[in-house]
Structures are given as C-alpha cells and as structure tokens.
Amino acid sequence: GLTELGNRWGYEDRLQRTNGQGAVLFFDVDCFKQINDTYGHTVGDQCLCAIAQCLRSVYGTSGRIFRIGGDEFCVVLVRNMDRIEQMNRTFQQKLQTMQVSGMPMPGVSVGYAEFDTSEEELNEAVERADAEMYRVKKEKKS
C-alpha cells in the first residue's frame, strides 16, 4: 500500500494475538481534508507517507504500526510501555520539523490506553484510546 504499513485487518489480527500487557495508540491527522482540497491528493499522499515514516522511526521497535483508515493510524505497543509519553512527545517534535512540498506537516492528534490480556480489557482500551484521540482533536479545534 501507499504507506507500506499494515491495514485494519492486520491491526485487528495483531490485537487478537497480543499476549500480556500492551497499549493501543490511535493517531488522526488534523485537517487532512483541507490539505487534499488545498494542495491536492499527491501532497496529501506525501503527508501520509511522511507520517508513516515518522511513526516507524519512533514506535517501530516497540510495536506494530498500521494505517487503519484514510488519515488514521494505530500502533499496538508490546514493549517500552513506560516510555509512551516520551515517545508521543518525540513523535510530535519530529513531525513539527518536517515539511512536504515546502508545506509544514499537519498536526496529528494522539490518544492511547493500556490493556492486559483479557478480551474485555482490550476492547475497553481500544474504546478509551479512540475517545481520547477525539478529545485531543476537539481540544485543538477550540
């Protein structure tokens, strides 16, 4: 695919095969439709690829990274749980230094939640992470 990341089916499979503790992180590109409408889909695609590369560089050794929708990404972390906040800060800092076609990178809203192995806890963590991502996104708009 475009970003060379796993897709939604790979993400769901990875969650089902997760043993032990972990975390799920959701990422949503801020104002992505506006980027496509203003600069065109080629620049939008370049943004997605750059974000995917940034995700790989920060989270790649600690978990698996997936593109689960148009401008939505997910990381399933299974290592370095104590470094989530640090990794999130590093990701945002790297993103702020990047450009695509002379344009600064858009912001990315992030939400995460930790889980253990029980299916109920895992499903709740996914819901919490998703809700947190949208809370952050809404907070940025106001």
Name what the model sees in each region.
Residues 85-92, 96, 114-142:
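Catalytic-core segments of nucleotide cyclases and related cyclic-nucleotide turnover enzymes
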Residues 7-23, 30-57, 66-70, 74-75, ...:
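Conserved long alpha-helical elements within nucleotide-processing catalytic cores of c-di-GMP signaling
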Residues 24, 73, 108-112:
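A structural signal for short, well-ordered beta-strand segments
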Residues 67-68, 95-113, 141:
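Catalytic core regions of nucleotide second-messenger enzymes
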Residues 76-77, 114:
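A structural signal for hydrophobic residues in beta-strands of small regulatory alpha/beta folds
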Residues 54-58, 90-101:
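Generic non-transmembrane alpha-helical segments
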